[in-house]
Swiss-Prot record:
InterPro entries: ATP_synth_f6_mt, ATP_synth_f6_sf_mt. Component of the ATP synthase complex composed at least of ATP5F1A/subunit alpha, ATP5F1B/subunit beta, ATP5MC1/subunit c (homooctomer), MT-ATP6/subunit a, MT-ATP8/subunit 8, ATP5ME/subunit e, ATP5MF/subunit f, ATP5MG/subunit g, ATP5MK/subunit k, ATP5MJ/subunit j, ATP5F1C/subunit gamma, ATP5F1D/subunit delta, ATP5F1E/subunit epsilon, ATP5PF/subunit F6, ATP5PB/subunit b, ATP5PD/subunit d, ATP5PO/subunit OSCP. The keyword Transcription does not apply. The lineage of its organism: Eukaryota, Metazoa, Chordata, Craniata, Vertebrata. This is ATP synthase peripheral stalk subunit F6, mitochondrial. GO terms for molecular function: proton transmembrane transporter activity. Its main location: mitochondrion. Keywords: Acetylation, CF(0), Hydrogen ion transport, Ion transport, Membrane, Mitochondrion, Mitochondrion inner membrane, Phosphoprotein, Transport. One of its GO terms (cellular component) is mitochondrial inner membrane. It comes from Sus scrofa (Pig). The modification Phosphoserine is found at S76. The modification N6-succinyllysine is found at K52, K67. Belongs to the eukaryotic ATPase subunit F6 family.
Amino acid sequence: NKELDPVQKLFVDKIREYRTKRQTSGGPVDAGPEYQQDLDRELFKLKQMYGKADMNTFPNFTFEDPKFEAVEKPQS
């Protein structure tokens, strides 16, 4: 590996520090209680708007094939 200049080294060190903090906290880093309150409030709004579905799963869609009728073509 090539040697990093001081700015690059500082940047890489901060990224590693952030990753470590995130892994230990198990969620957002440096988020206070107001963050969780805001998140809960916004999720509540979404549930009210979109039918109280689980916001962590992708919805299941069921599509039915259209029914076609056979139509006789007139002979010309």
